[in-house]
């Protein structure tokens, strides 16, 4: 009976999206329906996560067809902490959007498309078979294609073209990988694939397939293949930029973690060093981006790229500590990047400028805003006791155990550069000078202050309650790095030769 609740985090947003299509002219009802739905979704996800932590993973077999023949949803520590975190930030993002009163965007069913994107994101975390992961990716991407073009500006359309082309190529590669893998192992269920690949051992065909998935998911995660990201994020409004930054690349990172711990772990002599190399390249280019630009929205976009490098570096260490740190940092980064883009969006709103050298005098108007900015910088930099610290320490530990001293050095350097680029914005906000004149600021709306306050509290809470979060991420790491344990807890009836 409890397993039936596993469909609700995806079903509730889907039903709400359909209802909102017919309520586009009633903003008040739409607001309460959406926020109520996502709040309930977050609570249900958290309850399921608590149950899984105390007992065992939950599976839901649709239509009474057990794995590997039927569609299966899996609620384990990894999937449910991702669903809970994603549902929480989506709730805040939509509260932010309704607070802005985006009436023009509502005519294009903006809330519905955000919910459809949420369905794809949450479904990607919950599904336990390869084809349905592809379906969820396509739902997510179709909704994102619409959202990225809603403004109808030339800049958005140009960014959308790059975004669409690269993601279509990624989807083709994903589908090609699915076909080749099914031909090779004859199944699409995760646990069944893991068992059969383990029985096959080292195989050139499987290695080629794993490389195809690596490229496909790298395009989704902006790992090296990030050309679409800075331009796309820079032209979006604040809530959509926060939504994309918090979730879109993280789904790709999640898929990389799930695939290259559980499914293709026996090919780590090739894949994991390649992942570490790609992570290093991503970190370096991201660091160059945050230094090169004066546009604060593009600086924020390159911060996303750096964080993806951190996460995948942890995965590339192929150690328990590194993978555990990657999962922790992945969860943390969803919240922190939401906070970053809300702060950057608020800066643009209250000052009217996107170039940091034109920001000055904010200290006199909004001193508490500066406190939120500093906390965000420390969280991104991994300064104790804030939320970025535990994940980075574990990734450091994993890199040391793996002997990846170059990756470790690059992570330290790029972390400092990431902090420097944000402190540079902070300096101009408080001590900068624009021809000796003070910028005429708008007042930060109360709803923005409330949402920023909630995110700041959560960032601090993650750092303080790190042992609780690490307990979840450690369980997730243990389950996904042991295919035998995964089979025992998820699908004990399956055998490799079935």
Curated annotation (Swiss-Prot):
The keyword Transmembrane applies. The chain crosses the membrane at residues 2-22, 32-52, 78-98, 108-128, 130-150, 161-181, 209-229, 240-260, 271-291, 308-328, 330-350, 369-389, 406-426, 451-471. One of its GO terms (biological process) is ATP synthesis coupled electron transport. InterPro entries: CPA3_Na-H_Antiporter_D, NADH_UbQ_OxRdtase, ND/Mrp_TM. Its main location: membrane. Coiled coil: none annotated. It is a multi-pass membrane protein. It is found in: Cell membrane. GO terms for molecular function: antiporter activity; NADH dehydrogenase (ubiquinone) activity. GO terms for cellular component: plasma membrane. Keywords: Antiport, Cell membrane, Ion transport, Membrane, Transmembrane, Transmembrane helix, Transport. It holds the Pfam family Proton_antipo_M. Belongs to the CPA3 antiporters (TC 2.A.63) subunit D family. May form a heterooligomeric complex that consists of seven subunits: mnhA2, mnhB2, mnhC2, mnhD2, mnhE2, mnhF2 and mnhG2. NCBIfam families: PRK12663.1 (NF009306). This is Putative antiporter subunit mnhD2. The gene is mnhD2.
């Amino acid at each position: 009976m409890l397993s039936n609740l596993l469909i609700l985090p995806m079903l509730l947003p889907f039903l709400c999206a359909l209802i909102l299509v017919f309520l586009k002219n009633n903003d008040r009802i739409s607001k309460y329906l959406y926020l109520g739905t996502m709040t309930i979704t977050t609570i249900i996800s958290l309850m399921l996560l608590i149950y899984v932590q105390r007992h065992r993973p939950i599976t839901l077999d649709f239509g009474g067809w057990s794995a590997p023949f039927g569609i299966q949803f899996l609620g384990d520590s990894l999937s449910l902490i991702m669903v809970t975190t994603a549902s929480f930030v989506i709730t805040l993002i939509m509260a932010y959007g309704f607070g802005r009163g985006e009436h023009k965007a509502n005519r294009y069913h903006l809330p519905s498309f955000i919910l459809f994107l949420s369905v794809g994101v949450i479904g990607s975390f919950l599904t336990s078979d390869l084809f349905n992961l592809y379906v969820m990716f396509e739902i997510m991407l179709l909704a994102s294609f619409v959202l990225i073009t809603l403004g109808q500006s030339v800049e958005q359309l140009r960014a959308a073209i790059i975004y669409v082309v690269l993601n279509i190529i990624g989807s083709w590669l994903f589908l090609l990988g699915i076909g080749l893998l099914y031909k090779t192992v004859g199944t699409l269920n995760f646990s069944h694939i893991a068992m059969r690949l383990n029985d096959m051992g080292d195989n050139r065909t499987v290695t080629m397939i794993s490389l195809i998935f690596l490229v496909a998911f790298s395009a989704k995660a902006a790992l090296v293949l990030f050309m679409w990201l800075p331009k796309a994020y820079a032209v979006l409004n604040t809530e959509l930029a926060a939504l994309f930054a918090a979730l879109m690349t993280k789904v790709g990172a999640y898929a990389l973690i799930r695939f290259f711990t559980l499914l293709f772990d026996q090919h780590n002599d090739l894949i994991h060093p390649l992942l570490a190399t790609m992570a290093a390249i991503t970190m370096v280019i991201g660091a160059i981006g945050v230094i090169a630009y004066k546009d604060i929205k593009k600086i924020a976009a390159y911060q996303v790229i750096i964080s993806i490098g951190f996460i995948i570096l942890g995965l590339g260490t192929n150690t328990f500590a590194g993978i555990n740190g990657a999962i922790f940092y992945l969860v943390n980064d969803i919240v922190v990047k939401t906070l970053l883009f809300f702060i950057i969006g608020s800066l643009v709103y209250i000052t009217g400028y996107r170039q940091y050298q034109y920001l000055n005098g904010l200290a006199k108007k909004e001193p508490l805003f500066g406190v939120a900015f500093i906390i965000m910088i420390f969280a991104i930099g991994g300064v104790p006791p804030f939320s970025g610290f535990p994940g980075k320490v574990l990734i450091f530990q994993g890199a040391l155990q793996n002997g990846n001293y170059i990756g470790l050095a690059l992570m330290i350097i790029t972390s400092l550069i990431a902090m420097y680029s944000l402190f540079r914005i902070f300096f101009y906000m408080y001590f900068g000078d624009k021809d000796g004149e003070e910028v005429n600021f708008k007042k930060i709306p109360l709803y923005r202050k409330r949402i920023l306050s909630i995110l700041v509290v959560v960032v601090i809470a993650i750092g303080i309650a790190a042992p609780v979060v690490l307990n979840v991420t450690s369980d997730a790491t243990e389950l996904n790095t042991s295919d035998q344990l995964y089979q025992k807890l998820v699908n004990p009836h399956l055998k490799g030769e079935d």
